[in-house]
Design a protein with these regions (language model features):
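Non-catalytic terminal/accessory segments
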Residues: 1-410
Length: 410
């Protein structure tokens, strides 16, 4: 329990329906742990409902999270610590999500290797609202394969059915294992391990990260057969539905996996998926909107750079540099656009451009050209006034430079 407590305190996070924070957890345990422990051992402990939070999904719609109370988070973390070693050794080598020492990077590299080996068609399967649609009986039957303690089985089921509070009302839950608690990722892997074992038994090459599963085959016809048969397996065995609108049998370079895509060449180089670029641009625009009126250097240091650095770190596996060069240029243009807007009057623009080294004639022509901020931010006069080095001196990082730090010298 002490290890679970340390993990909960380290991860912090928002409070549940009781409003208690992780900083208040130790004091609560000092007062109430004896009673809580007794009810756990007696098999009578009743979790509180989770707090519902809806967050936007990158492709539209929302993802539903269920935030447990900090006490329930502690108990779930302890359960996770006990169950994880029991299952971990039996999980598939092709499963990468929510597992110790594994992650998205390994999954992406494994997917690339499958394509490079000649499997140049992908069965891209999207499970419809997976975390909201998990059948409790099917899941608990899988858990019971390795857990015989009826108290623990009952406690896990009560967590699954603990209800969800939204707008002051508690909704009963008959299905799903909402994301937000420590147990949910492990339970999802326990359920989908049946899928992994089925794919392995059939000899399929696949990569699965949580509910994101790609199967690699050598022809469209083979992919269509796999899509149909695996969809039937999921429906009949696990009572899960494949989202046909978001699933497809397609070339890997026309799909994305964990934010990445591939080039169509034989080498199948990793690249940033188009949608991932769009999402970054949307986030950058949000930062610019929230940072309007702030000192530019402070905005770059505190708001822009952390976002760019995290994005570059994740996509450092990309083997094509063009997208990073294009984004670097686009970000500088956004900054030039901000500065042009700040110079509201033509006379101010003229004076600033002169100070930045433009000739009198060129500064006048630019200041009174009547064009909009975005056009001017891409025009030569502002590129001369604000070259890349100007923003570098303000502390702006380069996405290309950041990712190149991870690239091996050729």
């Amino acid at each position: 329990m002490f290890r679970a407590l340390a993990a909960v305190e380290r991860n912090a996070g928002a409070g549940g329906v009781d409003g208690r924070s992780t900083r208040q957890l130790r004091a609560h345990l000092h007062q109430h742990w004896t009673q809580t422990k007794a009810s756990l051992l007696a098999g009578t402990y009743q979790p509180l409902p989770v707090r519902r939070v809806d967050i936007p999904k990158p492709g539209g719609g929302t993802r539903m999270l269920g935030i447990p109370t900090v006490l329930d988070r502690l108990i779930q973390q302890a359960i996770h610590q006990v169950l994880c070693p029991i299952w971990e050794g039996d999980f598939s080598e092709s499963s990468y999500g929510f597992r110790p020492g594994r992650g998205a990077r390994q999954a992406v590299k494994a997917a690339q290797q499958q394509v490079q080996s000649g499997k140049r068609w992908v069965v891209d399967m999207d499970l419809e609202k997976f975390f909201d649609r998990v059948n409790h009986d099917v899941l608990m039957a899988r858990v019971a394969r390795k857990v015989q303690d009826k108290r623990l089985l009952g406690l896990i089921r009560r967590y699954l059915q603990s209800g969800m509070m939204a707008g002051g009302m508690v909704e009963a839950r008959s299905e799903g294992t909402p994301q937000g608690g420590p147990m949910s990722p492990l339970l999802s892997n326990i359920l989908l391990d049946d899928l992994d074992k089925e794919l392995e038994a059939r000899g399929h090459a696949f990569c699965r990260y949580a509910d994101d599963c790609n199967i690699y085959v050598r022809s469209r016809r083979a992919g269509q057969r796999v899509m149909a048969s695996v969809s039937r397996f999921l429906r009949k065995r696990l009572r899960l539905k494949v989202n046909e609108a978001k699933s497809a049998v397609e070339r890997p370079w026309k799909r994305k996996f964990l934010g990445y895509s591939l080039t169509h060449h034989q080498a199948a180089k990793l690249k940033v998926a188009v949608e991932s670029v769009r999402r970054l641009k949307d986030k950058v625009k949000e930062r610019f909107g929230a940072g309007r009126g702030r000192n530019l250097g402070t905005f770059i240091r505190d708001d822009l750079n952390p976002l760019l650095r995290g994005w570059a770190n994740y996509f450092a596996l990309s083997e094509t540099k063009g997208v990073f060069e294009e984004l670097d240029g686009w970000i500088r243009r956004k900054l030039r656009c901000v500065q042009w807007r700040q110079w509201k009057r033509p006379w101010t623009r003229y004076q600033r451009l002169r100070k930045l080294g433009l000739t009198d004639g060129r500064a006048r022509e630019s200041a009174w050209n009547g064009r909009g901020p975005w056009w001017n931010s891409g025009a030569s006069h502002l590129n001369v006034a604000f070259p890349a080095g100007y923003y570098q001196r303000l502390g702006l990082i380069s996405l290309l430079t950041e990712v190149q730090r991870f690239w091996k010298p050729t």
